[in-house]
Amino acid sequence: MSRTYAELPRLMTLMTGDEKHEPSATSTLDVLWVLYDRVLRTSPDRLDDPGRDRFLLSKGHGPAAYYAVLAAKGFIPESWLSGFGSADSRLGYHPDRNLVPGVEISSGSLGHGLPIGVGVAHGLIAQGLPVVGDRAPRVFVLVGDAELDEGSNSEAIVYAGAVGLSNLLVIAVDNQSSSYGWGAGGIEAHFAVSGWSAARVSGRDRAALASALSASGSGPRLVVAAVEAKSVEGKS
């Protein structure tokens, strides 16, 4: 049974493990909901469908919101949430693709999701999967702004732009936790110089997120989802 956005806080509170990385989880909640509710062409009955969209959570150290959304959309039972982080639970502090239905990659070590996403996007093109509806399957990668400090992302960004991976979309949740900042033009300029189209929206405006995440173009796309700074997350 698919649940509503209003039920996510209750689902989140069911996870009582010691290390939920709450700021990392709450910063991604709206993006994750919009993806699974309005954008991604995937569902619990399409886990092995070659034509499904792929979602890669590179920001894997804050999976509580991810698990809540997967439960809300029927990928995992709600009853799993209360065991979060326990020794015999499928729901670890980092998502495991071998244990959690719907999880495409095991993540948590930062800087891996975007390079993997480039490879997956390339692989889908190489397979020549047919267009269903108005587009072929796409790859969506969720990263954090601080994670982009990792050098492994730079090569992936340049390569994706150079070969024009139009089936790749990266969402960067910006809570101003990057070590060095981004200077003039922000994260968007860092991607745009390599041939990406880029947009910035509020990471709490679900309508704006849906519009930005549904857009497509002739090359890879970046959507920066700006949220409250990490130092003040959870405060009014």
Name each region found by the language model.
Residues 138, 166-169, 197:
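Residues at the starts of beta-strands that form the adenosine-phosphate
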Residues 3-19, 172-173:
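N-terminal capping segment at the start of a domain
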Residues 150-174, 219-226:
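A short alpha/beta connector and helix-capping loop motif
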Residues 30, 61-62, 175-176, 205, ...:
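Glycine-rich beta-alpha junction loops
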Residues 179-189:
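Short, glycine/polar-rich helix-capping loops at beta-to-alpha or helix-loop-helix junctions
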Residues 19, 24-162:
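Cofactor-binding active-site loop characterized by glycine-rich and histidine/acidic residues
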Residues 148-149, 177-179, 230-233:
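Flexible loop/turn segments at secondary-structure boundaries
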Residues 190, 197-199, 206-236:
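Glycine/aspartate-rich loop-and-adjacent alpha/beta segment that forms the canonical ThDP
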